[in-house]
From Swiss-Prot:
UniProt-annotated location(s): Cytoplasm
Chief subcellular location: cytoplasm
Record protein name field: Proline--tRNA ligase
Function: Catalyzes the attachment of proline to tRNA(Pro) in a two-step reaction: proline is first activated by ATP to form Pro-AMP and then transferred to the acceptor end of tRNA(Pro). As ProRS can inadvertently accommodate and process non-cognate amino acids such as alanine and cysteine, to avoid such errors it has two additional distinct editing activities against alanine. One activity is designated as 'pretransfer' editing and involves the tRNA(Pro)-independent hydrolysis of activated Ala-AMP.
Domain note: Consists of three domains: the N-terminal catalytic domain, the editing domain and the C-terminal anticodon-binding domain.
Length: 583
């Protein structure tokens, strides 16, 4: 490719509404242009990267035995009604009516359609296993689209769905997809972790996220440096304490804490460590009777140590909270506790309030908590003496650095990540709700065991940039760079020798199957170099009259601090030796 025949449209400054590095650099480098909130056009150089990502994904999916198809972007409500997700999906699913007033949606995912295909086409166990995948546009009407392609409304995704005869076979399909994902992210050249994860709204009981490591990542990843343990912080278990609870050493006292409504403020006022305080969080569940009519509200008091944070995913697994919960209103809190948030505690609480203590709190003695009276806290609080043991003890908190690893092989560390892939074992969640069955060898109908596997193709671009950039621009991994090599002739319009040598190298690299661009725009060197550093091409060769006099050219990798002088006779071979394999 010659730059004069290509479309290069770089900007000196990013638009003022660009938030994160990847968004700013993709706009400045001419990869994307904003059309509406969360919706972008991909310019030729951006689409070039997308196609390279898609090629790697498609290659590994095919290698793993998956079969590509395409399902409709527009899907009828009837299929989604079968699983109950027409209502469950909420406002993120964009719904509309056609001219006949029939309900449709722009699909955010395709479990319903692919399950419908399976129940119509896969009649016998002899046709199993099957794994169907597509690479297609999706739409999710995010409440607040942000971070460019990282959290857009329209995006490209690879979604795959496996169908198996039993749990064991489904496990093999899951493992095959997990291995394929590892190969995909290895080939993409990204630093990543596969972490155990919560299954969320999709359901199922086995799940892993593939997280690209980046300081700007939205997700917290918990891992053990001394082992293979890794999990999303939503799932990572805080182990029960081995030490037994200490005996009470203090008397219970009601202590004035005027205007101190947080554990941090109380600890500072009293001159005590934050970890001696207990935080009270009030949740509520809306009860219904057998006819699904409202039947009152149950209030729950969840207790975590003052220096810990509540993990809402873990809270949602408590019996009684699994069907859904919300934070209690101030009115509900006042009715049960007699005061407002900031001074709440478990001592003397109405028996109708269910008390759930985090494992750490259940092991505490002489702790500080709210007195259920404005401007007062209790010190020297002890279980069994000052209040009954909690109704339930559970793992309620987020992991913190230094907690013991659940696999017993060291202490946990935390890093940030960007989720770019997710694999789920679904079981029969969808096949049962849609009555999707096949006949086994005895002629009896059985529900398919299913898995689903997603990769955010366009999200990978943003994640790769968040992980790989510097002050000058993007630093693409070789495998997905828009061009792997750029040849920069200095004095293209003035020197026959420069044009000859630059063209010769360009044609040699092209003949070797190397993805190279020749910058024949006759720009000033500073402009030319700045453009390609911003765009992020990993390898640059500069050919100019000064070097040609000595029979030399300059090579510089995008991460290199300085250029190296290479003899012209060795130049093509040298550049080839620097390129990472992409297959």
């Amino acid at each position: 490719m010659r730059a004069s025949q290509y479309f290069i449209s770089t900007l000196k400054e990013a638009p003022s509404d660009a938030e994160v590095v990847s968004q700013k650099l993709m706009l400045r480098a001419g990869f994307i242009r904003k059309v509406a909130a969360g919706i972008y056009s991909y310019l030729p150089i951006g689409l070039r990267v997308i196609r390279k990502v898609e090629d790697i994904v498609r290659d590994e999916m095919n290698r793993a035995g998956a079969l590509e198809l395409t399902m409709p972007l527009v899907q009828p409500a009837e299929l989604w009604d079968e699983t109950g997700r027409w209502e469950q999906m909420g406002a993120e699913m964009l719904r509309f009516k056609d001219r006949h007033q029939r309900d449709f949606a722009l699909q955010p995912t395709s479990e319903e359609v692919v399950t419908d295909i399976a129940r119509q086409e896969l009649k016998s166990y002899r046709q199993l296993p099957k794994n169907f995948y597509q690479i297609q546009t999706k739409f999710r009407d995010e409440r607040r689209p942000r971070f460019g392609v990282m959290r857009g409304r329209e995006f490209t995704m690879k979604d795959a769905y496996s169908f198996d005869r039993d749990v064991a076979a489904a496990g093999r399909s899951y493992d095959a997809m997990y291995a394929a994902y590892c190969r995909i992210f290895d080939r993409l050249g990204l630093t990543y972790r596969a972490v155990a994860a919560d299954t969320g709204a999709i359901g199922g009981d086995r799940s892993h996220e593939f997280q690209v490591i980046a300081d700007t990542g939205e997700d917290a990843i918990v891992y053990c440096p001394g082992s293979d343990y890794a999990a999303n912080i939503e799932l990572a278990e805080a182990l029960p304490l081995l030490a037994t609870r200490a005996a009470p050493a203090q008397a219970l006292e009601k202590t004035p804490t005027p205007g101190r409504t947080t554990c941090e403020e109380v600890a500072k006022l009293l001159g005590v460590p934050l970890e001696t305080t207990v935080k009270s969080l009030v949740l509520a569940t809306d009860d219904v009777d057998d006819t699904n009519k409202p039947a009152g509200v149950t209030v729950w008091l969840l207790l975590v140590r003052g220096d810990h944070e509540l993990n809402e995913v873990k809270a949602g697994k408590i019996p009684g909270l699994k069907a859904g919960f919300r934070f209690a209103t101030e009115t509900e809190i006042a009715e049960r506790f007699g005061c407002q948030p900031g001074y709440l505690g478990p001592v003397g609480v109405n028996k109708a309030v269910k008390i759930v203590a985090d494992r750490t709190v259940a092991n505490m003695a002489d702790f500080i908590c709210g007195a259920n009276e404005a401007d007062f806290h209790l010190t020297g609080t002890n279980w069994g003496r000052d209040l009954p043991e909690p109704d339930l003890v559970a793992d309620l908190r987020n992991i913190i650095e230094g907690d013991p690893s659940p696999d017993g092989r060291g202490r946990l560390a935390i890093q940030r990540g960007i989720e770019v892939g997710h694999v789920f074992y679904l079981g029969t969640k969808y096949s049962q709700s849609m009555n999707a069955t096949f006949l086994d060898e005895n002629g009896k109908p059985k529900h398919f065991e299913m898995g689903c596997y997603g990769i955010g193709v366009t999200r990978i671009l943003g994640a790769a940039i968040e992980q790989n950039h510097d002050a000058r621009g993007i630093i693409w991994p070789d495998a997905i760079a828009p061009f792997r090599v750029v040849v920069c002739p200095v004095g293209w319009g003035k020197s026959d020798a420069v044009r000859t040598e630059a063209t010769k190298l360009y044609e040699t690299l092209c003949a070797g199957g190397i993805d190279v661009i020749l910058d024949d725009r006759d720009e000033r060197p500073g402009v030319m170099f700045a453009d390609w550093e911003l765009i992020g091409v990993p390898h640059r060769v500069v050919i100019g009259d000064r070097g040609l006099k000595d029979g030399m050219a300059e090579y510089q990798g995008r991460r290199d601090a300085e250029a190296a002088k290479i003899p012209l006779a060795e130049l093509a071979a040298f550049v080839g030796s620097k390129l990472r394999p992409t297959a």
